[in-house]
Amino acid sequence: MNILMLSSTFPYPPTRGGTQVRTFNLLKYLSQRHSITLVTQREGDVTDAEVAGLRDCVDHLAIFERPPDSATTGILKKIQRFGKFLQQGTPPSVLNRYSVEMQTWVDNWVEAEKCDVITCEHSVNEIYVRSHFPKQLKTIVNVHSSVYATCRNQLSTGISENSLRDRINLPLLRRYEQNYCAKFSAIVATTEEDKIQLEEFNPNSKITVIPNGVDLVSFPNRTTDPGGHRLIFIGAMDNLANIDAVCFFSNEVLPEIQKLYPDATFDIVGSHPVSEVLALAQKPGINVIGRVPSMVEYLHQSTICVVPMRTGFGIKNKTLEAMAAGVPIVASDRGLEGLAVDGASDPLRALRANKPTEYITAISQLFEQPHLRSELSHNGRQLVETEFTWDIAGKSYEQVCLARSNTNS
């Protein structure tokens, strides 16, 4: 099968962030059995070696320069983009990355009948799929997280960067998500929660849940429990949901933990820490480490991984990676979305916390009880091995690609 994959985010190396991890690993699986053409955009920090590495993974690679960021284009352009959002329904964040050259390339490729399936790796790429494409080939959108649900959640939790803007945007995002989903033969979501949200917009759509996975070679199970009082958070530190998570934890939870355990430390590990995150390093016991060559080494040295997300929909790679590494987890409802960790019929695989007092209780329990750490470590790793590998996700994605489309004529 000839598959055309669209990803405006350059998906290599797969350590850059959640979008890259999911896109690359599904691409890698499909490329073993099918002919893959990838269309992507190159950002300024992408090296020639990374381009070469990605090229080795696909049959054909088409790269376009990423358009300049809207933040540098002035207020007039922003107003024009918002006007388009009101009139046409496409959010500025999607228009911001739109490339006319990339659109022309996609149109020509589809017109020449060079692919059987077109996949959008993250919903932002839906803009390149014309409304008539489903009549010619199968169209799939891989929704990493619902934009409407994410915006609504940011407003309800009070972490929106601009609440006035987002209150105006919310009904527009609902309309946008409903409209773009109608262009696709099949929709893929990462969690049941997102599936329910998308079904509300498109009750007749074929929606398949395919969770994220973990590369078990890159995230081996730890061989020893280091003990101590070392906490860790992992993730891209220019991501709004991650920024909120570490600021919340550093300001409202860690000081109380340090009253009980004065030697407790908190490592923030992940690429591109913004100024707000860098400033946390001034607080006692906090280490802002930035991007590292091996995330798993830092995980193995930690007593507990915390995932104090208050927003951000979809399954969290960071949670799965920590589980794979055998590190006990304390996480919020958002951090545990899509995972059966503490139900009545489930082995205990993580401790759940949403309020500061709940984090303090859960972390203290794990600091004090080596057998509880061992239980979570074993059960978390087992869950990933049986349900959340990229082979499992890849097989499911392949089935979606191969399934006969009702839309095709």
PLM regions: where:
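A short, well-ordered alpha-helix in the C-terminal region of glycosyltransferases
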Residues: Q365, L372-T386, S396-Q399
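Donor nucleotide-sugar binding/catalytic pocket of nucleotide-sugar-dependent glycosyltransferases
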Residues: K138-V141, Y148, D166-R174, Q178-N221
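Conserved catalytic-core segment of nucleotide-activated headgroup transferases in glycan assembly
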Residues: V209-P284, V288-Q301
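N-terminal subdomain of nucleotide-sugar transferases
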Residues: M1-F64, E111-E113
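Short hydrophobic beta-strand element within catalytic cores of glycosyltransferases
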Residues: K318-E321, P328-G335
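Acceptor-binding helix/loop patch of EC 2.4 sugar-transfer enzymes
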Residues: S8, T72-L95, T139-Q178, A236
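Acidic donor-binding loop of glycosyltransferase active sites
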Residues: S185, G285, E297-G314, A325-V327
